[in-house]
Amino acid sequence: MAAAALAFLAGSAAALYYSHLGLALSHYDARAHLVVSRRIFDSIVPGWQQIGAVWLPLPHLLDMLPVQLDIFYRTGAFAIAISVASMSVAAWAVARLVLRTTGSAAGGLTAAALFVANPNLLYLQSTPMTEPLLFATTMVAVMSVAEWVDGDAPRWPHAQVRSAPRIRP
């Protein structure tokens, strides 16, 4: 948990820094993600078809209600908060995976620190992009599979299979 807290603090500081410099929405795709999220409800033909054909839908589904407010749409603040939280979750999963593999708490914290200290990731998580959420979900999946393989979560695959019919459309 210390890794996640430190990642959240570093990510928040980076997000504030890049926002102050006016770089939070400088990437074209950052603005496009906000537009896709907003047009689900606010467009000439609103609907789920507006989610888009290029990107995976989860980030847009998470942002679709908050971006209806102009402050979140124009600044990307809610989507950036999701990115910062996602990188914190990814750092936690990295630390837990290294701790589980090596037995070293210092190694886990170091791995998370190296992950979070990457300047490219610090900038990326300071924008409303989809990659931080991808990193978080991937790292949690890898960590969960490692726990299952080690025998600490023997029912995990069965629970996933049983819940699958409940989440399909």
Question: Regions from the language model: what does each represent?
Answer:
Residues 12-32, 44-45:
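Helix-to-loop transition at the C-terminal end of transmembrane segments
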Residues 81-102, 140:
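Transmembrane-helix motifs of polytopic, lipid-linked glycan transferases
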Residues 101-102, 141-159, 167:
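Membrane-interface transmembrane helices that cradle and orient dolichyl/undecaprenyl
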Residues 1-15, 147:
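Start-transfer (signal-anchor) and selected internal transmembrane alpha helices
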Residues 33, 87-90, 115, 130-142:
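Hydrophobic core segments of transmembrane alpha-helices in multi-pass, intramembrane catalytic enzymes
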Residues 7-8, 108-119, 143, 164-168:
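Short helix- or helix-capping micro-motifs
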Residues 35-36, 40, 50-72:
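Short hydrophobic/aromatic helix or loop-helix immediately within or flanking a transmembrane segment
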Residues 55, 120, 126-133:
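Short acidic/glycine- and proline-prone juxtamembrane loop motifs at membrane-interface regions
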